[in-house]
Design a protein with these regions (language model features):
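Single conserved hydrophobic/aromatic residue that forms the stacking wall/gate
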Residues: 387-397
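TRNA-recognition modules of translation machinery and tRNA-sensing kinases, especially anticodon-binding
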Residues: 1-389
Length: 397
């Protein structure tokens, strides 16, 4: 029979890779929790309405969601991103009424898009979200968390931070109209995708990967010419904090995020080492989303890290240094010695519970087992012998 393979764009993570993933996830978790953030968990499947209500015109909703009807006929979707689900969970569990929670979560997301280096149909994110705070200080905290993380992983010097301010709703409406008026003059040069974005959410055209469209946009109006004084002051205060902390940045007036709910601060950490998939972390404010999803008005901000891309970069730069946690490797040459070895291993763990012990029960040749013991990285390899006919037959009696 033919073997069954994984779905295209959905990848297995084998044991050696899991060690790398666990290392990276633990580093991120330790940094985030050192700032008082707490873990939250919520389902990977939600009502489709959760995503259509929060991102009606976004590509992930119009083209990329895994959506189907369950047996009751209700439309449900695999989560394409985590923020909407986190907001829903915070509202459902009444986390926002008396507190200003700082939360983190990690797990798989799903988007039906063309698989390529650094981009899969099932991918993983580590995210942090903050609710109830509307000052530039909390925006700065999230950026400082990410900067500290990059330093701990040894890649800070190779990354660049880009920041923009999308203003309030009126700013985005005025700017969108100006953008449409400008781009309409180039309608014959716009591709089908650009025309769709121009109709549904003009700001999204700024994120186009088309060189021809980016050339046109060089002369397009900038959103900073439409933001009000409050937004300008907000961004100035944020940048002042980053200057004080020595975190370099570039203000990119064309930076937008791929989801519709962002306002005011948006930011990305990028690298030049991964080709077109250059964004490692993206985040921003979404002050209207809680109310849009049925909660009371509540400011919020968050970021997400693409774990596949981060681990790809760390391996490329040889920044993952794994140490084995195996203390003892038992080598056995017969069923009798194997039995004695597993009993001995259990007694050792009874005495010292923290011991990590692996027993080879394959009964391979001596050479093969010694090679495996060496490859395991164990601190000690123990040869388990009994004077039996089996051992004598092996020439070890």
């Amino acid at each position: 029979m033919s073997k069954i393979q994984t779905l295209r764009g959905m990848n297995d993570i084998h044991p050696k890779q899991v060690k790398e993933w666990s290392y990276v996830e633990e580093v991120i978790k330790s940094v985030v929790e050192s700032y008082g953030y707490e873990e939250i968990r919520f389902p990977v499947v939600e009502k489709t309405e959760l995503y259509t209500r929060s991102n009606e015109a976004a590509d992930i909703v119009t083209k990329e969601m895994y959506t189907f009807s369950d047996k009751s006929g209700e439309s449900i979707s695999l989560r394409p991103e985590g923020t909407a689900g986190c907001v829903r969970a915070a509202i459902d569990n009444d986390l926002l009424r008396t507190d200003k929670p700082r939360l983190w979560y990690s797990g798989p997301m799903f988007r039906y898009e063309r698989p390529q280096k650094g981009r899969s149909r099932q991918f993983h994110q580590f995210s942090a979200e903050v609710f109830g705070l509307s000052s530039p200080e909390i925006d700065a905290e999230l950026i400082m968390i990410s900067a500290r993380l990059w330093k701990k992983l040894g890649i800070f010097e190779g990354l660049r931070l880009e920041i923009n301010n999308l203003g309030d709703e009126q700013t985005r409406k005025s700017y969108s109209k100006a953008l449409v008026d400008f781009l309409t003059k180039f309608s014959k040069e716009l591709d089908e995708e650009a025309i769709r974005k121009l109709t549904e959410n003009p700001l999204r055209i700024l994120d186009s990967k088309s060189p021809a469209i980016q050339e046109i946009l060089k002369d397009a109006p900038l959103i900073e010419d439409f933001t009000n004084q409050d937004s300008k002051n907000y961004q100035a205060n944020l940048l002042e904090i980053l200057d004080e902390m020595g975190i370099g940045y570039k203000v990119n007036p064309r930076l937008v995020r791929g989801l519709d709910y962002y306002n005011q601060t948006v930011f990305e950490w990028k690298t030049d080492l991964l080709g077109s998939q250059d964004t490692l972390l993206g985040g921003g404010r979404y002050d209207d989303l809680v109310e849009e999803l049925g909660g009371k008005p509540c400011p919020a901000i968050g970021f997400s890290i693409g774990l596949e891309r981060l681990i790809l970069l760390l391996n490329q730069e040889d920044k993952i240094k794994l140490e084995t946690n195996l203390d003892i490797y038992f080598i056995c040459f017969s069923e009798s010695t194997a039995q004695e070895a597993i009993i001995c291993a259990e007694k050792l763990k009874d005495k010292i519970p923290s011991l990590s012990i692996k027993t080879n029960l394959g009964l391979e040749s001596a050479g093969s087992q010694f090679k495996k013991a060496d490859k395991s990285g164990a601190k000690i390899a123990l040869l388990c012998l009994l004077y039996t006919s089996d051992a004598a037959d092996e020439g070890l009696g």
